[in-house]
């Protein structure tokens, strides 16, 4: 995925 959840994982 490349959504908000993916961004938060960084």
Curated annotation (Swiss-Prot):
It is an enzyme of class 3 (hydrolase). Optimum temperature below 60 degrees Celsius. Active from 0 to 100 degrees Celsius. The keyword Metal-binding does not apply. Disulfide bonds: none annotated. Inhibited by sodium ion, potassium ion, magnesium ion, calcium ion, Cu(2+) ion, zinc ion and Fe(3+) ion. Keywords: Antibiotic, Antimicrobial, Fungicide, Hydrolase. Has ribonuclease activity towards yeast tRNA and polyuracil and weak ribonuclease activity towards other polyhomoribonucleotides. Has weak deoxyribonuclease activity. Displays antimitogenic activity towards murine splenocytes and antiproliferative activity towards HepG2 hepatoma cells and L1210 leukemia cells. Has antibacterial activity against Gram-negative bacteria P.aeruginosa and P.fluorescens, and the Gram-positive bacterium S.aureus. This is Antimicrobial ribonuclease. It comes from Pleurotus sajor-caju (Oyster mushroom).
């Amino acid at each position: 995925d490349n959504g908000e959840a993916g961004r938060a994982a960084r």
